[in-house]
């Protein structure tokens, strides 16, 4: 079987994207890095986004860190998801930065969260720390859109969390709020502050926040599609 090659330009169809992702299934991160001419870091401590970058190279992703989807022409977002030996997610999944000001008139339908989760290419990757990074294998991809029930679940959480932000309760939000979608601080250091609305409607400075999918949501999603027991 011939070795796969990274896509040199963004895929033109979902079928092309999925076919390329399927070719990567079973390869280790070290093998894919070597084929792409990259060096595999020893661990992810200083290169937290390295796996995502590697797979973006292989799949011809275009967005980088821009707010649009990774495959903007197709409206598809790429999400790598570290899993254990049973295929269960090991951590929450970052969706996007949570807007803390300027939220008047924003609805679920027009929200950045929904835009990012409208169509997702999930790629599970072995994530157990006992496996050296270079030896971790890439799993079968899944091209997914939320069904009615998933959309309703996410919408309810989003509305609850956004109400708290708009009403000046940002400092009261914990990772426990929201059944499937959570908000928590997203900053490499505690000095990176951003503006938000305070309890009395005043402007305050707080840590940037991000929206994350909880493991119970991604776990059910993967189990349903891959028939994990």
From Swiss-Prot:
Keywords: Cytoplasm, DNA damage, DNA repair, Endonuclease, Hydrolase, Nuclease. The keyword Phosphoprotein does not apply. Coiled coil: none annotated. The keyword Transferase does not apply. Sequence-specific endonuclease that cleaves unmethylated GATC sequences. It is involved in DNA mismatch repair. HAMAP family: MutH (MF_00759). Belongs to the MutH family. This is DNA mismatch repair protein MutH. It comes from Escherichia coli O6:H1 (strain CFT073 / ATCC 700928 / UPEC). The gene is mutH.
């Amino acid at each position: 079987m011939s070795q796969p090659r990274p896509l040199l330009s963004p895929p033109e169809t979902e079928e092309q994207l999925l076919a390329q992702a399927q070719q990567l299934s079973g390869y280790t991160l070290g093998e894919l890095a070597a084929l792409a001419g990259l060096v595999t870091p020893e661990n992810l401590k200083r290169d937290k986004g390295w796996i995502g970058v590697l797979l973006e190279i292989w799949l011809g992703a275009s967005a980088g860190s821009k707010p649009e989807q990774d495959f903007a022409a197709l409206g598809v977002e790429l999400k790598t998801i570290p899993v254990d030996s049973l295929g269960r997610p090991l951590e929450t999944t970052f969706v996007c930065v949570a807007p803390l000001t300027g939220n008047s008139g924003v609805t679920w339908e027009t929200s950045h969260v929904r835009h990012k989760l409208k169509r997702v290419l999930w790629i599970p990757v072995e994530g157990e720390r006992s496996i050296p990074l270079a030896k971790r294998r890439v799993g079968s991809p899944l091209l997914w859109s939320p069904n009615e029930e998933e959309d309703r679940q996410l919408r309810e959480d989003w509305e609850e969390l956004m109400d708290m932000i708009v009403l000046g309760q940002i400092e009261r939000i914990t990772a426990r709020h929201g059944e499937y979608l959570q908000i928590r601080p997203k900053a490499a250091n505690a000095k990176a502050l951003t503006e938000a609305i305070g309890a009395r409607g005043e402007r305050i400075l707080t840590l940037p926040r991000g929206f994350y999918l909880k493991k119970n949501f991604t776990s059910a999603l993967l189990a349903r599609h891959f028939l994990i027991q």
